[in-house]
Amino acid sequence: MEKIEEQFANLNIVKRSSETKEPTYLLGIDTSKTVQTEKGSLVAVLCSNGSIRIHDKERLNVIREFRGYPGLNGVKFANSHDSVYSSCTDGTVKCWDARLASGKPVQLFKGYPSNIFISFDISSNDHVICAGTEKVDDDALLVFWDARINSQDLSTTKEPLGAYSETHSDDITQVRFHPSNPNMVVSGSTDGLVNVFDISADNEDDALVTTCNSVSSVSFIGWSGKDYKQIYCMTHDEGFCWWDLNHLDTDEPITCLNVPDVREVINVKEGILDYLIGGLYHEKTDKLFVVGGTNTGIIRIMNCMTSGLVHVTSLQGGHAATVRSFCWNMQDDSLLTGGEDAQLLLWKPGAVEKTFTKKDSMKIASSVHQRVRVHSNDSYKRRKKQ
């Protein structure tokens, strides 16, 4: 098998989305998990104008657009059907059917009064949705719903199952369910904490498995490692932390790597690193990669090891401005990227690169980088099993 590092270095642009009437930042990307042999896979893109665009993955044509929803955060396909979800600052998580052109949400998951949702995820079996709120008064909540469709109850609005309120003290910026265990979920916050929960427990205190401290405002979290027993996060000031949950019940340190500012330590061939975008765990090779970029649109891919981060390759000639989102497909080794130049790009290894005209960057103020805060220095806190 070709080394994954060589595959990344071999990525070239296959397709570029056509220009839209209203250029927007592309803030989030996800692909449908269902097999669609006739129509091909679908791609959902969250845009900065409060819309979600559904693209055909092979041609990147816009099939339909769900418009008019300012305050959306994140975009995610269900794992077993073509429903698309996004959380909203209006206190709901919205669900659309990507196959329907009506544009109206088919389901609304309502929060508690004054909830402002800024993060969410759906469990691997599509049974539970969890959303994180901004801090209002003294509360930052993780709110849960039953996402299953009940033939006895066909109402389109769902009330919460309950909420966790004791474990974060500030905006909950990230929520990520375990890729295969629907009971495990990790959350990250501007309070610097990354909390791991087992939601099969009876209450919040028992559900909290461990608390890790990134010492800064969390911008991205993910699962990695064999059986996904590791977690990692990035921070709004470009830090990176990586923890091994296998060591919770041992004397081994839980922290695999802690880099306060990746920009200062990474040795990038031919240039610099301006920011981190997210992480990519390659299950087949059991390798974790960190994805970052430059303000001129170059994408940097870095290999993550306990000894540090090593620059693997740079993807150039695609974007003309900051890259805000990406989605890696393990099945065909393809990469989708979106940025502040309003472009959606499809990259594949060894593809014939085509010549395109770079679009100028649109300068829209980003609120996410105004949330940087520095916190106490305890890198993690173990919870003793009773």
Curated annotation (Swiss-Prot):
Repeat region (WD), residues: 21-65, 68-106, 111-155, 167-207, 213-253, 318-357
InterPro entries per record: WD40/YVTN_repeat-like_dom_sf, WD40_repeat_dom_sf, WD40_rpt, WDR89
Superkingdom as given in the UniProt entry: Eukaryota
SUPFAM superfamilies per UniProt: WD40 repeat-like
Gene3D superfamilies: YVTN repeat-like/Quinoprotein amine dehydrogenase
PANTHER family listed in its UniProt record: WD REPEAT-CONTAINING PROTEIN 89
UniProt-recorded name of the protein: WD repeat-containing protein 89
Source organism: Bos taurus
Protein's gene: WDR89
